[in-house]
């Protein structure tokens, strides 16, 4: 979607006072939160397109972030449609976990509140803030006030990376819970299937996070964001060798937190 107007730029390259005020973090945050109350203004079709391409070609998703920067002078999303759809996915999959684990209504509701407000929002805010600090502090090519990683963009990168992880671990894995956790939890096939799904899910998270920050032209050495793959591979080999079952641990954790 093309904007109806573009920011006015002075000859010295700075925004006019009116446009600068409009592009402050507070103004962007207010506009984003306001649109949460107006579903008709959200582009859900485009959000679905992004969700599909996060699995098949995540680079295309970040090309759109480049386009938004050129047309709207911000890297972060200004449309909360993606967040709304992600929240729906999270709620539906959590209810599915409650059903598969034979939880009652109150237990499922408690699990849903934990997953939404702690696992998704709380952990998401923590990771986004950490990445925002690290990238601005250590990965800037030329630190200055004109170029910085927006906190909203760091949060968007987290949401992008979190979505495939959510689908794999909270949706697709539901179809294997009985075999991975109940029937074959201590068998090689059980923890091999479960741990492989964890490997793929976390691998997606690391890779999409790397793509998000490598898309910013003013950052350097973003390849360091791929280093967790080494630890991930080591943990996977150890888990298979020692018979650790991550999915069984997740189910135990979910049941324990609602008791």
Curated annotation (Swiss-Prot):
Q: Which residues form a coiled coil?
A: none
BP terms from Gene Ontology = protein localization to cell surface
Which UniProt key words apply to this protein? Golgi apparatus, Membrane, Nucleus, RNA-binding, Transmembrane, Transmembrane helix
Membrane topology of the entry: Multi-pass membrane protein
InterPro entries linked to this entry: UNC-50
Name the PANTHER family for this protein: PROTEIN UNC-50 HOMOLOG (PTHR12841:SF6)
Q: State the function annotated in the UniProt record.
A: Involved in the cell surface expression of neuronal nicotinic receptors. Binds RNA.
Put simply, this protein is called Protein unc-50 homolog
Give the organism the record lists: Danio rerio
**The organism's taxonomic lineage, starting at the top:** Eukaryota, Metazoa, Chordata, Craniata, Vertebrata
| Originating gene | unc50
